[in-house]
Amino acid sequence: MGSNAVKLGTGAATGMFFHAPSGTALPTYPTDTLGSDWKEVGYVAEDGITWHHGRSATPLKDWSNSIRRMLQDDATGTVAVPIISTTKEVLETLFGSGNVTESAATSSHGKLEAVEVKEGVISGEEAFLFLMKDGDDTIMLGTTKGFITTLDDISFAPGSAITWGATVSADAWKLILDDGQVTT
């Protein structure tokens, strides 16, 4: 096994984190040109994304305490994503497009983005896609139906980027790795 088996999860320079309406088909290959429904959300912080593919199960045991069957309790996967862009697209992704309004610049203020934060409300379902690149290798992680289920605390401090830490949750994820070695 060579060193090429060790992959880096570096975000693709031309886009890293995308969203589209729920049910939008994922690309077949990580290098495919994305359809017009896919919109780039924003820059991901240097720590990258964290995929948690968790499942839990309850063992069913017989009288001798031997496991006879496993009942699956939960199988939701999550991606934690720290977003360092502060744009209308980011705000709409995190808080829902119906909760973000934009006002044009006037003689008394610049262009305004206003967010109505409704606690306890989860934004609607969407398709999500993360693209990574390491040399010729490309990696794609996506879901056709996911939700932003948690938002981390947001720090507004001098000397550091405003980071919108979000968790995308979905029942089904697709991971594709392409070594980039095409045949002729």
Question: What does each model-identified segment do?
Answer:
Residues 69-91, 159-175:
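Oligomerization/assembly interface segments of phage tail-like spikes and tubes
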